């Protein structure tokens, strides 16, 4: 290799490290820390069986049409354990140290090779050295280093993975790509050696970990909530008869993006009149008329964590007497739900408290004759866990660190 070619290759290898250093001043710095992800991996490994292995895959790129992809969204579990937001990657977490490709440890990650042509079109690929530098992971390899002989499964007693149905890795077999290739190899080994798949146990472990938020996570959820509230407040100021639902959505999502939110936490719901009674209405096309109410169920996602905020306001800025009565009943129910959020209480307590207020109120108003009839106007639960997923996983007991929503509602067509 001549000197010129060697110099070019050195620049190519050093570039990601220089770029990562520059990002500390040119890009957001409030992502989850490498120490956070390392701590979560250690906590997961602690809960594995004596000789278990956890296997997690990055999300695949999804095609929107022809040669255009959807904006990439990482698997939440993979993100939780690594922070990496690239496709075509696999994480292995072992209870006991093993040796893979002459490296001994309990954590191994396989990632994409750097590719100048792909990077020209879709942006920088971190590669092995970039992942080591950014996420402080030691045992990092390229996908093409993974073969059927890479892992000795003979001593493994259980495989912990969140995937099953038609073979737990079937979702990765649709397209021939590096991720599918690795998944097929792992699946073949597991089937050949009859290793049990602890899918249910995996979900229970993930729920116990992800359900109790760490301080870094709470800060990101609070940021997502603050961004979301800014959007809701501006919609309340801007709404007027003649505005379209999609204009309310545009105002909302403008605030999300201008405050650094990567995505909405879920498709924005902005429904007026009859559309406000469709729980997951996302068409957002109707013109909002005088006297109608607009329900906005919209929230930002910030660095992987979602908020969840719903507000209902009159288009003309003034509640009718009937609208005010129902609004205040829902507010009273929400306050009852908040009061029931006590550490150690069953997860269902806020729902029971809010539902009692709604049912009694609707019967007193003569809208419902009994609880069964009242339920038609309050058809969903009051609370769910909130975090990496807007409907997140978590324990069935209200423990310190649990974040949940309290969102009763009354829907009268």
Feature-to-residue mapping (PLM):
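Bacterial Sec-dependent N-terminal signal peptides
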Residues: 1-23
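Active-site neighborhoods and metal-handling regions in enzymes and metal-associated proteins
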Residues: 22-413
């Amino acid at each position: 290799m001549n000197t010129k070619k060697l110099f070019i290759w050195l620049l190519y290898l050093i570039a990601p490290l220089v770029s990562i250093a520059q990002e500390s001043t040119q890009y957001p710095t409030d992502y989850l820390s490498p120490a956070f992800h390392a701590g979560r991996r250690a906590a997961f490994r602690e809960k594995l069986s004596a000789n278990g292995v956890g296997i997690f895959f990055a999300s695949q790129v999804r095609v929107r049409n022809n040669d255009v992809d959807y904006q990439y969204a990482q698997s939440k579990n993979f993100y939780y354990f690594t922070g990496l937001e690239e496709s075509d990657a696999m994480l292995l977490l072992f209870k006991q140290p093993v040796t893979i490709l002459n490296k001994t440890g309990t954590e191994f990650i396989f990632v994409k090779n750097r590719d100048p042509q792909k990077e020209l079109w879709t942006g920088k690929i971190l590669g092995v050295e970039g992942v080591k530098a950014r996420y402080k992971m030691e045992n990092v390899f390229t996908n093409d280093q993974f073969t059927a002989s890479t892992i000795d499964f003979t001593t493994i007693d259980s495989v912990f993975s969140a995937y099953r149905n038609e073979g737990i890795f079937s979702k990765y077999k649709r397209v021939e790509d590096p991720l599918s290739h690795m998944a097929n190899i792992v699946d073949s080994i597991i089937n050949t050696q009859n290793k049990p798949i602890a899918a249910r146990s995996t979900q229970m472990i993930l729920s116990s970990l992800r359900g109790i938020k760490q301080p870094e996570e709470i800060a990101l959820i609070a940021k997502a909530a603050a961004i979301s509230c800014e959007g809701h407040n501006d919609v309340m100021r801007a709404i007027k008869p003649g505005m379209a639902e999609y204009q309310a959505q545009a105002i909302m999502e403008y605030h999300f993006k201008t405050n650094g939110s990567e995505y909405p936490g879920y498709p924005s719901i902005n429904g007026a009149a009859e559309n406000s009674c469709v729980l997951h209405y996302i068409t957002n096309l109707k013109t909002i008329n005088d006297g109608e109410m607009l329900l906005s169920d919209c929230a930002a996602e910030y660095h992987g964590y979602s908020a969840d905020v719903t507000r209902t306001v009159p288009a003309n800025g003034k509640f009718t007497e009937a609208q005010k009565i129902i609004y205040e009943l829902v507010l009273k129910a929400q306050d009852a739900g908040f009061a029931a959020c006590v550490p150690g209480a069953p997860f269902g307590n806020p729902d029971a408290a809010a539902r009692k207020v709604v049912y009694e109120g609707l019967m007193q108003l003569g809208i419902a004759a009994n609880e069964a009839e009242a339920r038609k106007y309050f058809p969903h639960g009051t609370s769910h866990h909130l975090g990496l997923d807007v409907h997140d996983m978590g324990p069935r007991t209200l423990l310190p660190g649990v974040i949940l929503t309290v969102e009763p509602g009354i829907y009268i067509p």
